[in-house]
Curated annotation (Swiss-Prot):
Organism this protein belongs to: Methanococcus maripaludis (strain C5 / ATCC BAA-1333)
Described purpose of this protein according to its UniProt entry: Binds to the 23S rRNA.
Binding-site positions, Zn(2+): 20, 23, 35, 38
Name this protein carries in UniProt: Large ribosomal subunit protein eL37
Entry keyword set: Metal-binding, Ribonucleoprotein, Ribosomal protein, RNA-binding, rRNA-binding, Zinc, Zinc-finger
Cofactor(s), by name: Zn(2+)
Any one Gene Ontology molecular-function term assigned to this protein's record: zinc ion binding
Annotated cofactor note: Binds 1 zinc ion per subunit.
GO terms of biological process kind: translation
Ribosomal protein in keyword set: yes
Domain of life of the native organism: Archaea
Amino acid sequence: MTKGTPSQGKHNKGSNHIVCRRCGRRSFHVRKKVCAACGFGKSSKIKRFAWQWKKVTGKGNRVK
């Protein structure tokens, strides 16, 4: 077997993320046991931030 750059291409097998049980997205990190999308495994609350939605404008109509 050779070493060097040609061998590095053989390291792309397997996957770091699998389908999350809570949100259903392919964001659950296998080794960390944490979902990158919803925070499952780290927090009991769904991960969310204020910058995910546009700011409230006018009479309080939230625009997505």
